[in-house]
């Protein structure tokens, strides 16, 4: 069930956040309003992936700009503005097929994480090169991967391959 996966991922993120010094600890905002989610969908021009909707309904944004290179996940209003400005690609291609996508997160370096509308797979867009690469097969998988980054950051692991 999608909701349980998102809830599990949020618990994992909160646990990982607890490993960090208080000054670097990520913040978890309250739920986005129905109007904010509707405005995001209007900007995207599609129904957003169910898992991302569940995330926004539970936690509008996760802000961790002091963790490694910075993570900003969600934020319905900010994402709607970004989509309206055309900040990031609206289509993701795996080499053989292209599919509509939307931004769901950014890092501290100006890159974005895009979710394909149809399947929720998450891709990293490098704003300097224009290259888009797969990161996770699902939004909850992406959130679990971010949690792993945070665990390794808390352990001062310089060998870990961070996604940001």
Explain the meaning of each model-derived region.
Residues 22, 152-156:
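Intrinsically disordered or highly flexible coil/loop and linker segments, enriched in small
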Residues 130-153:
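Compact, glycine/acidic-enriched structural inserts
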Residues 1-113, 160-164:
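A surface-exposed partner-binding patch
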Residues 116-119:
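Short acidic-glycine loop/turn motifs at beta-strand connectors
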Residues 114, 124, 133-134:
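A sequence-level detector of short linear motifs
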Residues 93-97, 128, 132-135:
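Short capping loops/turns at secondary-structure boundaries
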Residues 121-127:
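Intrinsically disordered, low-complexity regulatory segments enriched in Ser/Thr/Pro
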């Amino acid at each position: 069930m999608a909701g349980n996966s998102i809830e599990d991922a949020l618990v994992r993120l909160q646990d990982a956040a607890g490993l960090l010094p208080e000054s670097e600890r990520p913040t978890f905002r309250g739920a986005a309003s129905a109007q904010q989610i509707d405005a995001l969908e209007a900007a995207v021009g599609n129904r957003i992936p169910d898992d991302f909707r569940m995330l926004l309904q539970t936690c509008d944004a996760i802000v961790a700009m002091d963790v490694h290179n910075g993570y900003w996940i969600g934020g319905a209003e900010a994402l709607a503005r970004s989509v309206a400005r055309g900040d990031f690609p609206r289509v993701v291609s795996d080499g053989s097929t292209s599919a509509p996508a939307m931004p769901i997160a950014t890092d501290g370096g100006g890159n974005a994480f895009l979710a394909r509308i149809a399947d929720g797979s998450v891709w990293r867009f490098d704003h300097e090169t224009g290259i888009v690469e797969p990161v996770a097969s699902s939004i909850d998988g992406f959130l679990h991967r971010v949690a792993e980054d945070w665990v390794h950051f808390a352990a001062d692991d310089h060998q870990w391959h961070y996604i940001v």
